[in-house]
Amino acid sequence: MKRACAIVLVLLLTLSAVGCTGQNQQQDSVYKTNLMLDTIVQITLYDWEDSSTIDLAFDEIRRLESLLSVEQEGSDLYRLAQAAGKEWVEISSETEEVLRLSKEYYTLSQGHFDVTIGPLVDLWNIHNGEGHYPTQEELDETLPLINSDDLLVEEGQAYLAREGMIANLGAIAKGYIADRVKDLLVEQGVEHAVIDLGRNILLIGGRPDGSNFTVGVQDPNQEEGVLADTVAASDKSVVTSGINERKFTYNGKEYHHVLDPFTGFPADTGLASVTILSDNSAQGDALSTTCLLLGP
């Protein structure tokens, strides 16, 4: 798996995708933005006039987030965490699909991609914009809870084998949601579009004139908006994981949010970010995080 990541990094970019340059300037297009999934979501439809189609996509994002967000009370993931070590929980077909995908990438990555990292995410608390540097005792208590072998999935239900376990789909949910939004838009007849979920960008076709979309690549070492390069692509996913997205400072040292499930600390592989070009966004989401953890 590490060799595969190295090949990906050579062929693609160890930078960060930030959007499609010039995507709002083309005529005969409609777009809308919304604050969702803890980011700014923008959907642009080309050669299309009915903006209400985008509202359908936003509704689908909200529906899926209500299932997959561990922080939303009553969601599948919230209930799964509450029942950890106690009982099986009924889940939607969408949640089942994402959990099964997550376990596949857990196996493929030899445990580096692990959605049961939830207790460690909560311990460091970087995602809430605060940050907590854990003691060794806290890490010793938390690390045994991280093991996707103890995440059991059957048709319509799931179970976390030990009390205190938490499945957090932050490393794959956006990609999965982008794929489902693409399916919805294609069913509506859309042939040319950009689905931008922050650093998860999914392209439907190319531009109406037959040319590729151009995805801007942010320089991870520069301020927001400074591009290092661009990627020309059609009907592809462009997904980035980066250590500069969320971080905090403790005793003069910065700590980022991409946590290693083996050490309990933020990944330290020498990579600032990884961009994956792939056929679907869930795949790109999982692989970008995995490659960032494994290094070149």
Task: Describe each region flagged by the PLM.
Residues K2-P296:
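Mature catalytic core of soluble alpha/beta enzymes
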